[in-house]
Amino acid sequence: MLENKKHKKMSLSGKSLLMGTLSTAAIVLSASTVNAATNTDTVDNANASQVTTVKASASVNKNDNSGLKENATNDKVAGTETNLNSSLNSGKETSSQVNDSKEDSSSTQVGSTPISSAIINNGKASSDLNQDSDNISDHFKDNNSQGQSSTSSEKTELKGKIKEIVNNSGIDVTKLTNDQINNLNKVNFDNDPQDGTKLTLNDLDAIGQALIRRDPKYAVPYFNAKEIKNMDAAETKDAQTGKTETLEIWDSWPVQDPITGYVSNYKGYQLVIAMMGMPKKNDNHIYLLYNKYNDNEFSHWRNAGSIFGYNETPDLQEWSGSAIVNKDGSVQLFYTKNDTSNGKLNDQQLATANLKLNVDNNGVSIASVDNDHVIFIGDGKHYQTYDQFSNGKNRNRDNYTLRDPHVVEEENGDRYLVFEANTGSNNYQGEDQVYRWANYGGNDKFNVNNFLSYFGNNDDQALASVANGALGILKLSGDQNNPTVKLDDVYSPLVTSLMVSDEMERPDIVKVGNKYYLFSATRLSRGTKGEITRLANKVVGDNVAMIGFVSDSLTHGYVPLNGSGVVLTASVPANWRTATYSYYAVPIEGKENQLLITAYMTNRGEVAGKGNNSTWAPSFILQLNPDNTTTVLAKLTNQGVWVWNGDSENKNMIGSLEKDSPNSAALDGEWGKFIDWDAINSYSLKPHQPVTPNVPTTPEKPENPTTPNTPDTPRTPEVPTTPVKKTTQSELPKAGAKDGIAATILGAISSMLGVIGLAGISKRKRNN
């Protein structure tokens, strides 16, 4: 027994000696290891002043008739300032001047009044604005306190054209990592397939900056919140329950004259079709509303009921579209069928139906709905199909769209549909789009910074790789009352937003004189530049906009209005009563330089308070200038005005951003109210799901959550905020004299501990 105890003691001593020996060896190894280590510079975003000049190439569609085969290239407005710090202090834009006229000299009242104090975004106050704005543009601020980089013998070299571009950008090439250089060397400078005009990342950035600085040329006017009412005609029989319910109303469109686009005078009435449904329910169906032509009174609107009856279900919904009058007096409706049955994620299809109406002393009623059928589900080449989407990669981040058909009739009787979609296999989504230089659209510094920013942010890069928004066009065939689509009449897109955005909603073409104006509602949060969305949400409290393009031809040649495409931008927080969206432009009879802008007001789900339902907004005037610019005018109407006349203007609707003003744009209690983005977006359509970022730090709480495919599904964020980057080094620092001394001391301490006899160390499990 004594021998055994002695043996055990000797064994413990042996372990201690072994630990001492190993620790001594560790001193030598640690010193050599530290001396051999090199530091990889981290890359962060910093603010940089960038002046960009952009040229938009508007290419002809592939499948156009021979008479349409021409290229139109137009210069965008130059001099877009992209320094957010400076733009936040500016209420004006140094772009082209607005043509003044005696009649229309009034301008929108939206100015530079601070609004950030009115906003709380998911618990995070906007006082961090300056800190966040410092992280927008310049990707190359060196965070390494030692300023060291890899030796030239270890560095990969830039090659070819990208080398010159990086040098021109003013970026220190020595600060680039090998991974960054390898990615830059993969940049694709080839010409794009001819898929119409590009909405570039630089355009998206400029749109965001205009929104953030609340540029008065583009900002939606402030409305007097105390004047806003729910719609009387929204108290009606619900399409799903068959019972009288209080409904909300949002996306709406008038029945229009097929040639002029004016709101049709249909036997003395104006007709509007609208999406309606119960608050906080998965209830999305379309109804017919009517009022006497030229009647400006909101309370006079009446509801003719659900177009497709009262046995509707949440699984089969109708979304927005357009409508015109046929030669026989019937109404041709174009709309979106949305199928969410059997687990589908918004299987959208373009559809049409023929409506025959009765008009008598009791008003307007629906006599019959005939020839209801789907006319287009995508062709796979020009436009993505649901099967391509559902079988694709990164589906949890992808956003499938094929909706919002807008009908246009040419003078020769040919009818076309313009619609929201995603690009097909001819120019498809994918990681290769992030390498396509034409998608960036800015100067060298902007392009390089943002290219590397994608590869430093897994979330934005993943979104960019699936972003493939498109505004499409096709030609209709067959009888007016029962149209069809031939595959040969499916043209390539008018506008694409590959890598930039996955969603450009509700396209609307208005012909004014000899020009075609193409508009679309969108959100910065559907784009792939997360920083600009977060900043917009902090400064303004919302990120919605309307973009626009102009061409001399219906089927090709569109160039962005105002240089970047920005036409309208949000001006108040999304949870205020006076927040607006789903903008729709209507031509004004007798006015070739003005359009009437309609919208819905108050986001769905009672986000502005109990009983404050989504309703029609007051309309306002958009000035069209001869130099392809636009200006918002402070000419407001009652709610629900679709036909502008001499009695339409109502100055009592003009609001103010002053908190205690009697015409404040905010209701009592809205100023400084917490913005719950889950609730704001809970009725949107995007099925994105968040992905855990592959970084060691804890992500911040997302400020811009996405929307689910169905309104009753619990909401998750669409664009999680970029996680806070670690300020500590993730690798061993490059050794200096102090580092060597520190390593020696640590090794000596380890030796002492080993000699003392930490025998238990040998029992620890290794972490594999």
UniProtKB/Swiss-Prot annotation:
Record localization: Secreted, Cell wall; Cell surface
One GO term (biological process): carbohydrate utilization
Catalyzed reactions per annotation: [6)-beta-D-fructofuranosyl-(2->](n) alpha-D-glucopyranoside + sucrose = [6)-beta-D-fructofuranosyl-(2->](n+1) alpha-D-glucopyranoside + D-glucose
Membrane-related topology note: Peptidoglycan-anchor
Regions annotated as coiled coil: none
Region of interest called Disordered, as start-end residue ranges on this chain: 57-158, 688-736
EC number: 2.4.1.10
UniProt GO molecular function: levansucrase activity; metal ion binding
pH-dependence of activity, as noted: Optimum pH is 3.5-4.5.
Top-level taxon of the source organism: Bacteria
Motif (LPXTG sorting signal): 732-736
Thermal response of activity: Optimum temperature is 55 degrees Celsius. Activity drastically decreases at 60 degrees Celsius.
PTM sites of type Pentaglycyl murein peptidoglycan amidated alanine: 735
One Pfam family recorded for the sequence: Gram_pos_anchor
Residues annotated as signal peptide: 1-36
Catalytic site positions: 251 (nucleophile), 505 (proton donor/acceptor)
Residues binding Ca(2+), per UniProt: 398, 429, 468, 502
Annotated family: Belongs to the glycosyl hydrolase 68 family.
Name of the protein this chain belongs to: Levansucrase
Highest classification ranks of the organism: Bacteria, Bacillati, Bacillota, Bacilli, Lactobacillales
